[in-house]
Amino acid sequence: NRNKIENEYFESNDEFNSKCIPILYKEVNYNFIYERIKKYDPDVMIVFGSSIIKEPLLSLSKKNKFLNLHLGLSPYYKGNATNFWPFINNELEFLGSTILHIDSGIDTGDIITHVRPKIEKNDNVHTIGCKIIQESAKKMGMILNLIKENKEINRIPQWNTKNEKIYKLKDFNQGILEDYLNKIENGIVQKFLLEEEEKF
């Protein structure tokens, strides 16, 4: 189901259009990666779906030019699968992504912008995820244009919230998946849309 949905949203998007350095997820903080990127001296670096970036790689950050696309709304949802957990917690208002300046924490950098999807009645975690990625890519393009034009980009420090949640891969299990499927079957998305409609 997931592959089918991703193919609908991202047909013919299994290759990069530009030259890139292939880096395996677990290798991101290895010294040979640091040396290679240092030699390459990129104008801008964007992290998406990586583990935490550590020193010395973090030190290559140029002012406002090391960005992280986090698929979750920081500071509320951080860590892993952060557009899955709002379904479990009945908090669909926290679906989205955050484009932020990278730092050494888990999705804790200063915020550039949030991206929110248009939620529709037949959506699920996969369709929502694809919509968020599409909208985030458009927004990232706009931010890169600002950087290219030497314009300032937002730098909003994350605020304290008692609702902050940090999820790890180990939090995901069979019971949680069954809970998600039950919520979809019982109309969590439709109920959310109805509640949103009633606010206006």
Stretch-by-stretch model annotation:
Residues 1-200:
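One-carbon transfer enzymes
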